[in-house]
Each structure stands twice: as structure tokens, then as C-alpha cells.
Amino acid sequence: MEKYITFAVEEHMTGQTVEKVLRTALGLTKRQISRAKFQADGIRKNGVQCRTTDIVQTSDQIMICIEAAKNDLNHLVSFCEDAHPLEILYEDEDILAVNKPAGILTHPSGAHYADTLSNQVSGYFHKKKVFCRVRPIGRLDKETSGIVLFAKNQVSAQRLQAQRESGILHKQYIAIVMGSFSDDTSALSNTAWHTVCFPIRKTADHPLRMEAITDFGSSFVPESADFVTPLAGMTTLLSAVTHYQILYRSPDWSIVTLKLDTGRTHQIRVHMKALGHPLLGDTLYQKTFPADSLSEQPVFHRTALHAWKIQFRHPFNNAWISLEAPLPDDFCNCFQNINFSL
């Protein structure tokens, strides 16, 4: 699949070579540029084929053809798309956004090499004769439902990943947690946002479990830095920042919406547990449930977490894109029982 990218040379790029601006302005690799160089009209300046050593001037129009290499094509085992239909939220020639159901992995791992969301996307691409690698931008845990974004080419993937790391691309989640938040916590009403800054590390007693280190209280932890602290016995910690808003409270459970400044493994699950409000259905972080409240809590057979919204800039035209994933049945049933709506 070919992708043509055009951009205007900015003043600070004047005097540089075509290759340099392709690498710095577009983030292209040397291999991508080399492949384009040997195509007919693969690289053009102001509509005329040019060399990568040519010098550019302000306002020059540079166009390059990005063609998928053979080893860049989809290599995953494909699900039959008819048997496993995708719920597509948005699609164009550069990106695909889908609503992931709970119960499947985002991409192959361990014994799951052919039954993941990425395999479903592979089958969808195959059916549409779209020949490109499956590139998820971030992932969701197996039991988490909601929006997953895929890039259809390497440049889109690079730019979306850069947005994710800088915070331009961000998601908003809905979760149902155990317990009622104290009056002090929600004193500013349900419209207030609260922040958790506990760093996270792997536990020593379980290969999958993470834990929050609460020695730091609510003090700020630089979101870009992994650091070493004597408080953790010189164990490497991962900074983690979660913002949450309380939407509904009952004596035994609450509904919250959350946004992340960092994207650590199990971050929402670990931070909510550290606050004393583990997610309903999360058997990894809450083995037992209070007997006196079981009858009052909704029944969830998976972790009660849904990636609800996403906002980002289109990787090529820079337009803002905002998407929302419809709630799954278990969330809808819970909300209907209490006459709650978002």
C-alpha cells in the first residue's frame, strides 16, 4: 500500500538537504527514504523528481511516496472477520479506531497468538485488501473494554505514539469501584477532579501484579522520570499520575471517570486499590469481597473498566479527533438499575 506525504519546507529548514528534512520533519527512517528514492517520482520537490542531496528553500513543496516493504506487511494470523466482526468507531486511510470487547487481548501474547483484537483487525484488513501491518497505539488489558486505536502506516504510528508520550493523545475511562468515597474526598462536589501520584512497581510475590508505593503520600512525582528511592529499598519505581472524578456514590460502590498522565501497567487498578477502592470484578487485586455488601454491589464477571473516550490530532492534517465508545451491556445494566446516565 502506497502513502503520499506532502509538506511545505519551513524557514528554519532552509539550506538543509531533502534527506535531512525528511528525517527530521517527518520522522522517516533511512530505509523508508531509500525505498522511495528508487521509485519513479518517489521523491519530488515542487512537482519535479529530485535527489535526496538537493538543498531545500523556504516554502518548497516536498512529496514522498511511502511504500510498505514486504516485511512490513501484515504478518498476523487472521480471524475470519465475518465470524468476529469489529465495532468500528472511526476509519480513514491512516488510522482505525475500534471498540474492544472485554475478554480478549489487544495483541498476541503467550498462548494467545491467533485470538486477539489485533488478529481481528488483521482479518478485517485482509478482507478489505488493505495490506499493512497491524499497529496498535497503546493497549487495553484483557478484561478492559473500550477504544483501541490502530495506525495503518509507520508514519502515522510514529506520530500518534509521540502524541501519546507528550499527552496530546489522551483517553478517558469509566470504572465502577468498591466502597463509597469519604465526604472529605468529594467535598468539592462530583464535578471536582482529584489526583493520585503514587509511584508503581512490580510486586515480588506475583508475576503479573503491580503495587503502589504510598510512602510518598500525595506528593508530586515527575511524570517523565523513572527513579530510584531509598524508601523502596533501592527498587526502581515508575512514576504514575491518575486523575479521577466521582460521578456516583452509594454506600457500597461508586462510579468514577479517570484520566491518565502516564500509562503504566494496571495503573488505574493499582491506584484505585491504593485508595481503598479496588475495581469491581478485579480478582487480581481484590481476592475477597466484603460479605455484608455483596448483595448491594453490581455483579461484574470481569474488571469493571471501560476506555470511554479518546482525543488526538490526526497524524497528517492535524485536525482534532474526538471519539466515544458506547458502554458495554454490563455497564448499561448497572446504570439502568440506578437510573444513572453519563
Question: Residues of each region from the PLM?
Answer:
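RNA pseudouridine synthases
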Residues: M1-L342
